[in-house]
Amino acid sequence: PKKSYIEDNVFIGPCACFTNDRYPVRVKYKLRGPIIRKGASIGANTTFLSNIEVGEGAIVAAGAVVTRNVPPWSLAIGAPAKIKALPPKLRVPNRI
């Protein structure tokens, strides 16, 4: 959507849904899409509320519903997504 930013070496799985309006057609609200930092991986069928930042190297698991920022090099999993430590073996840059 408008006002979204995706940096380099990002993987976005199929059917990921990004929003840019937290209150659709209800109030005047500044549109703010997600910011996806370099090297992040977004799983299939994920949903992001507006104005969310996914940090560098973070992974969002398939089917997650992201309602808050995901710190760099962490794992977001579940609905709503909970933030977990990224396993050490996954703390490597994407090879896209």
What kind of region is each of these model predictions?
Residues 1-77, 82-83:
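Structural signal for interior beta-strand "rungs" in well-ordered beta-sheet cores
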Residues 87-95:
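A glycine/serine/threonine-rich, flexible loop-to-helix segment
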